[in-house]
Amino acid sequence: MFYVNKIIGWVLSPLGMLFLGCLCGALLRRCGGRIGKRGLHRLGTLLVSVSLGLFWILSCGIVTRFIGVPLEGDEVPLLDTLELGGCDAVVLLGGGMGAHEVCGRAEMFSAADRVWEAARQWKAHQNGDLKLTLSGGGVEQSTVPLLKDLGVDEEALVFFPEARNTEEEARMIAASGIRCVRLVTSAWHMPRARMLFERAGLEVVPVPTDYEMHYCAELPLKIKDFFPSADALWRNSVAVKEWVARFCYWLKGCRSR
């Protein structure tokens, strides 16, 4: 299922649809021309045109309001989560960080809000044995230094480097004996992440952050939002990937019933 999700996510991404659509369209045009089938030639032209049209649409900022904002949904509570009850661990999903070999320090990307929020949650609730969990490779050189700078004790950090996705991380955390977590992730990712952690048997206090989709949608609408841009392409690609992931897990849930 892990690799199926990855493949489907790429195929349905704006760049994936453009590449495959244009490739298939070009092959149909070529085959149609060589064997004298005008129908195939026209179908190839149509496929290329549709691919370019979809790429244009999914590269426009206004589309984020329709496919990005709903991901962050009303079910994610917009409140000060510091006031909620304590848990066994703060779970930091991802972190939007990278290690910079040139300058020798961590680099913060668009989702780095997660790291700051995780540190804030840990400092507000740490009682001597509160853990802060991390996953993925390279966090020791990227996320960990920033967490330490923000006041998190290194002894409190627990690593799950083998986890390839959110589902696997949830299972590993549950298997470690942790029962209640404060789950920190981007708002667009929270509904699916919360579902996976609860499915693993964990009690979840959601701590959404990084409301990037809502932030972009709240900006005044401008003419440029109707034209392709790299920023809009990135956000809409993230949105499409998340919708595909939710659909795949929905299918998986239906089959297991």
Regions found by a protein language model. Give the residues of each.
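Membrane-interface helix-boundary motifs at transmembrane edges
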Residues: 30-43
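A structural signal for short, hydrophobic/glycine-enriched beta-strand patches
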Residues: 57-233
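Structured C-terminal subdomain patch of bacterial secreted/periplasmic proteins
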Residues: 228-257
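Hydrophobic membrane-insertion alpha-helices, especially the h-region
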Residues: 45-61
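Hydrophobic alpha-helical segments of integral membrane proteins
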Residues: 3-8, 63, 67-71, 240-247
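Transmembrane helix-loop junctions in multipass membrane proteins, especially transporters and channels
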Residues: 34, 69-74, 250-254
